[in-house]
């Protein structure tokens, strides 16, 4: 990853785009597919890089920024449930200084002179849920989903042992939130059953819990050893108690399971002592935890702190360091991705780390192999932070055998045997054979049908591989003629292994449904290198319609200077990305494929809708000392209402809020005839927005 302090604005723009796409994909895999692609530590590193870039270049923050979102868009097979209060994720603290900063932010934000009591509890590595009771009867159970809309899993939650279906002496409307999990020993037993039945084993306890909850048949869920803890009252918690410790006492009285391992800390020292206690004893707990959650105990103070886009300000998660293990590197295999990028993968002697068996680890790029001096048959150190794919930290050189083998970086593609192209600035090796490379073609079709592209349900990895192997499809266009081909064939798809009449009917129905697609989704589905969802939206906004888009791309092939300049001027499309677009449309087969797709698809023109309020997009400046609220609280409220808070006054400023001892900014605002109000007027204004 590049040094944030030295990065240029253009480089930052490109990196933010890449991070948005990567993190969105990782979120979808984690929250929706229950199949994490990277470790917690690697995800956190990417997310923190994104935050640092946004702090340095706030004007480059994307509409689809990971810092604005929680989780991932929900799938279609469950009914949707809208959370009255969003189920947001927590910010992370990785060391004691991060925790001290968290405590200091609370003091500064709330203008406190003393330490405000902090409630500490284990961070269970499970699946978040919400349960709603009306007149004491359980009516709705839901997953977190994207934080705003989850999936209805009421029938499945009711199968969990000791989960109350009816409770007494509670308000007419009650919500509880918590974590559903599977204990370590139960997980091992479950995987043993899966293996005996010839089924795939679960990667870890969290995946097993998530997969169990997302069963359409609740009788399957009932057979899984699910357990739960509640830790929040959601929209109704402040009707039950005035603090977190009181709330848990009340929920326990109602019959809910709460985690008895908790601590109400009255100092930083008590916080750190509890953290060390849990870190030392985590392996002795029956369930997996990956850190400690700290939250302001007082609900009134929580209300004042409020939220940022995806996190509450009043809480944070102090993560445990990753678990380290050692095993043998058996071999290095190479995967070819959608855009031709080759990625080395370490094949390992299976090792159990934190209750999970690990046999593979990504090596990211070929330079990492050389930098770490990795050799086949070496003993390597693995780092795992609660997920599936660990990271190789280095080699145990003291145990290096005499017969180790160095890995030779390939010169030719392992899929199509074409000569590989090496780009030092990207630290990658790429196959430029495009659709003629079977591996790239497979990944391109997988991308085309994926959730955020054409969204063709029923065409997963195995199904795409099967259809390609049988010669039924060879490019994205073939998908839309699959039914026609099947109808005229003697060898029907529904009679083949892994298929049935119902699954084939559903597939054809979903293919037909996908023919109505928005222009941004269509452009994203094409799989142009570095054109993620955000850049696809930029192009769609610029060209408006499919016909204009394809016409302009054909002009680009003729080196038309106007279209080149138009693209180059787009915010978010730098020189490097422009080269990728040109390279894609320089391939005649790509243009022909897109035209044929355009003939059979209904590609909707681009439309942009935004909710408006009186402060949306207004530029507000705060100056001087505000009598009753902190500057941070005022800024947070303004941003929550859609305003942009600037540090300096200019002709673009819409409003200046002036406190005591306002200086040069107030003077400049008067000179520019900008509207000026005091704190009292500001509080009245935001109350009426």
From Swiss-Prot:
List, alphabetically, the SUPFAM superfamilies matched.
BRCT domain, DNA ligase/mRNA capping enzyme, catalytic domain, Nucleic acid-binding proteins, RuvA domain 2-like
Q: What class of enzyme is it?
A: ligase
Where in this chain does the record put each BRCT domain? 610-689
| Signal sequence range | none
Catalysed transformations (reactions): NAD(+) + (deoxyribonucleotide)n-3'-hydroxyl + 5'-phospho-(deoxyribonucleotide)m = (deoxyribonucleotide)n+m + AMP + beta-nicotinamide D-nucleotide
Active-site residues from the entry: 123 (n6-amp-lysine intermediate)
What is this protein called in UniProt? DNA ligase
């Amino acid at each position: 990853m590049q040094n944030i302090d030295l990065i240029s604005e253009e480089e930052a723009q490109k990196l933010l785009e890449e991070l948005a796409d990567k993190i969105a994909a990782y979120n979808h895999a984690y929250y929706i597919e229950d199949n994490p692609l990277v470790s917690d530590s690697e995800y956190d590193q990417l997310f923190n890089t994104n935050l640092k870039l946004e702090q340095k270049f706030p004007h480059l923050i994307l509409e689809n920024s990971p810092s604005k979102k929680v989780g991932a868009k929900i799938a279609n097979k469950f009914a949707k449930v809208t959370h009255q209060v969003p189920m947001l994720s927590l910010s992370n603290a990785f060391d004691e200084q991060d925790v001290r900063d968290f405590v200091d932010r609370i003091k500064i934000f709330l203008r406190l002179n003393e330490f405000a009591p902090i409630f500490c509890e284990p961070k269970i590595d499970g699946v978040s849920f919400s349960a709603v009771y009306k007149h004491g009867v359980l009516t709705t159970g839901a997953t977190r989903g994207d934080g705003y809309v989850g999936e209805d899993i009421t029938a499945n939650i009711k199968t969990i042992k000791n989960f109350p279906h009816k409770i007494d002496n509670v308000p007419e409307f009650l919500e509880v939130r918590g974590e559903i999990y599977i204990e370590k020993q139960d997980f091992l037993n479950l995987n043993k059953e899966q293996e005996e039945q010839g089924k795939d084993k679960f990667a870890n306890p969290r995946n097993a819990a998530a997969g169990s909850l997302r069963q359409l048949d609740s009788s399957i869920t009932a057979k899984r050893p699910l357990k739960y803890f509640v830790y929040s009252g959601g929209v109704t918690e402040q009707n039950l108690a005035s603090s977190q410790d009181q709330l848990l006492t009340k929920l326990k009285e109602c019959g809910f399971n709460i985690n008895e391992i908790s601590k109400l800390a009255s100092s930083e020292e008590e916080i750190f002592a509890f953290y060390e206690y849990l870190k030392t004893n985590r392996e002795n707990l029956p369930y997996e935890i990956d850190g400690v959650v700290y939250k302001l105990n007082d609900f009134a103070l929580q209300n004042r702190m409020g939220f940022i886009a995806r996190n509450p300000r009043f809480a944070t998660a102090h993560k445990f360091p990753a678990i380290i293990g050692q095993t043998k590197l058996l071999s290095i295999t190479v995967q070819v991705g959608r855009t031709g990028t080759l990625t080395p993968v370490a094949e390992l002697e299976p090792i159990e780390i934190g209750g999970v068996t690990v046999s593979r680890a990504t090596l990211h790029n070929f330079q990492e192999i050389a930098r770490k001096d990795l050799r086949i048959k070496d003993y390597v150190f693995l780092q795992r932070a609660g997920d599936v794919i660990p990271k190789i930290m280095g080699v145990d050189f003291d145990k290096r055998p005499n017969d180790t083998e160095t890995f030779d970086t390939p010169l030719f593609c392992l899929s199509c045997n074409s000569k590989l192209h090496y780009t030092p600035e990207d630290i990658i090796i790429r196959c430029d054979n495009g659709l003629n490379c079977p591996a790239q073609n497979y990944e391109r079709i997988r991308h085309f049908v994926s959730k955020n592209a054409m969204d063709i349900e029923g065409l997963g990895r195995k199904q795409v591989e099967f259809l390609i192997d049988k010669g039924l499809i060879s490019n994205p266009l073939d998908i839309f003629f699959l039914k026609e081909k099947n109808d005229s064939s003697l060898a029907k798809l529904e009679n083949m292994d892994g298929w049935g009449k119902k699954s084939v009917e559903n597939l054809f129905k979903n293919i037909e449904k996908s023919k109505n697609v928005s222009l941004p989704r269509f452009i994203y589905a094409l799989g142009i290198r570095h054109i993620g969802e955000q850049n696809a939206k930029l192009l769609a906004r610029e060209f408006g319609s499919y016909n204009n888009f394809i016409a302009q791309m054909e002009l680009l092939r003729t080196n038309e200077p106007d279209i080149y300049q138009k693209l180059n001027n787009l915010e978010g499309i730098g020189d490097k990305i422009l080269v990728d677009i040109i390279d894609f449309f320089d391939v005649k087969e790509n243009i022909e494929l897109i035209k044929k797709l355009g003939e059979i698809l209904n590609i909707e023109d681009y439309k942009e809708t935004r909710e408006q309020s009186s402060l949306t997009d207004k530029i507000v400046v705060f100056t001087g000392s505000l009598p009753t609220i902190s500057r941070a609280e005022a800024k947070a409220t303004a941003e929550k209402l859609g305003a942009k808070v600037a540090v300096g006054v200019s002709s673009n400023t819409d409003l200046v809020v002036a406190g005591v001892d306002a200086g040069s900014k107030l003077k400049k605002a008067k000179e520019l005839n900008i509207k000026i109000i005091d704190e009292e007027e500001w509080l009245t204004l935001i109350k009426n927005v």
